[in-house]
UniProtKB/Swiss-Prot annotation:
Disulfide bonds: none
Enzyme class: isomerase
Protein name: Peptidyl-prolyl cis-trans isomerase-like 3
Known EC number: 5.2.1.8
SUPFAM superfamilies associated with the record: Cyclophilin-like
InterPro entries: Cyclophilin-like_dom_sf, Cyclophilin-type_PPIase, Cyclophilin-type_PPIase_CS, Cyclophilin-type_PPIase_dom, Cyclophilin_A-like
Catalytic activities: [protein]-peptidylproline (omega=180) = [protein]-peptidylproline (omega=0)
Alphabetical keyword list: Isomerase, Rotamase
Organism: Gallus gallus (Chicken)
Similarity comment: Belongs to the cyclophilin-type PPIase family. PPIL3 subfamily.
Function: PPIases accelerate the folding of proteins. It catalyzes the cis-trans isomerization of proline imidic peptide bonds in oligopeptides.
GO CC annotations on file: catalytic step 2 spliceosome
Length: 161
């Protein structure tokens, strides 16, 4: 399975690791299918680290899962924050996943086994480059100009056009 995030600065195609993180992918795909992420801003953007989105409030404090509550982490020794373009759930401690997620700008091994890796960017690294270049508020790391997820396309075949 794969999805394409259509953003204000371009598209990002993400392969999902449904076999290793079934609950996380079920949640993410259901939120995508219900247009939950449409209009969400990238509210946190730290050059060299990651960009975060998935909060419909746009504050970094909102968002929920399809079950209406936080859900457990799904860690795998095979899924690491080892390269640019890793997609993980954002959380505020163990087993507190909701709707927010982030995409890494590089290798981040200190995040392994703390944040559920559930996908990787397979196309659109140039869009990730554009996100990383955005000027941000130096205290909050929020982009000075909002960039949104416009909508999301779900692909059954991650290699389909």
């Amino acid at each position: 399975m794969a999805v394409t995030l259509h953003t204000d600065v371009g598209d990002i195609k993400i392969e999902l690791f449904c076999e290793r993180t079934p609950k996380t992918c079920e949640n993410f795909l259901a939120l995508c299918a219900s247009n939950y992420y449409n209009g969400c801003v990238f509210h946190r953007n730290i050059k060299g680290f990651m960009v975060q989105t998935g909060d419909p409030l746009g504050t970094g404090k909102g968002g929920t899962s399809i079950w209406g509550k936080k859900f457990e982490d799904e860690f795998s020794e095979y899924l690491k924050h080892s390269v640019r373009g890793v997609v993980s759930m954002a959380n505020n401690g163990p087993n507190t996943n909701g709707s927010q997620f982030f995409i890494t700008y590089g290798k981040q091994p200190h995040l392994d086994m703390k944040y559920t890796v559930f996908g990787k960017v397979i196309d659109g690294l140039e869009t990730l480059d554009e996100l990383e270049k955005l000027p941000v508020n130096e205290k909050t790391y929020r982009p000075l100009n909002d960039v949104h997820i416009k909508d999301i396309t779900i692909h059954a075949n991650p290699f389909a056009l």
